[in-house]
Amino acid sequence: MQTNDQPPKVALVTGAGTGIGRAVALEFLARGYRVVLAGRRPEPLEHTRVAAGDDSARALVVPTDVTRETSVRELFDETQRAYGRLDVLFNNAGRGAPAVPIEELPVETWREVVDTNLTGMFLCAQAAIRLMKAQNPRGGRIINNGSISAHAPRPYSIAYTATKHAVTGLTKSISLDCRNDGIACGQIDIGNAVTEMTDRMAAGILQADGSTRVEPRMDVGHVAKAVADMAALPLDANVQFMTIMATTMPFVGRG
């Protein structure tokens, strides 16, 4: 929680209209941050803002398509105009793809997943870095949303798995290249939080051995608190990688 003698820190959350992004945005607001809510669709973003209750006055809704460089530039320009700086980027926006064999995956679907999960994350990180280097005081923190799929794939998930492995490379490169500018970069790898994206797990999901089984899920609030705790560290300390998951979910080798 921020103290009264400190100006509120500024966080930007992509994919803030639903799921993990919404939960993290609400947690930041509850901890006293000013929060920029970014996502493709205005209505879910507005629902997130309203859900913040008394904290909603510190939320700014900015509809954004992270796959478009101009849209991302406008997002960060609006953040700077409204708040003058950026302390934390939660680089969260992402999407999956239908579970099909590799040879049946349309290249258009592959490109859409890469555009959102990797290029979109790069564009947001790039814009955040430019702002964090220019602001006074300099620096800030970037937290990238990885996945258990950054460690081990699910069956028929090549596009999602490949992009999440690539996010790990993005995190490492940002950490190396930007640490001397006061910018810390870490990654949180999340497994089976209760969101719309994981609803299918309650009905059963394909396993590596070919069976279909229900998988346990955890409260998304645990993820939100973990991200906010990562963000709360001073910039001379960094959680480089964190894995948070439902305790009994399949993980190593997805077994």
Regions found by a protein language model. Name each.
Residues 17-19:
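Conserved glycine-rich cofactor-binding loop
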Residues 125, 163:
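Active-site helix of classical SDR
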Residues 147:
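Residue(s) in the substrate-gating loop at a strand-loop-helix junction
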Residues 100-102, 109-114:
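Substrate-binding pocket helix/loop in short-chain dehydrogenase/reductase
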Residues 63-74, 107:
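The beta1-alpha1 cofactor-binding region of Rossmann-like NAD(H)/NADP(H)-dependent oxidoreductases
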Residues 130, 176-177:
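Alpha-helical segment proximal to the catalytic Tyr-Lys
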Residues 187-188, 207-253:
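C-terminal helical subdomain
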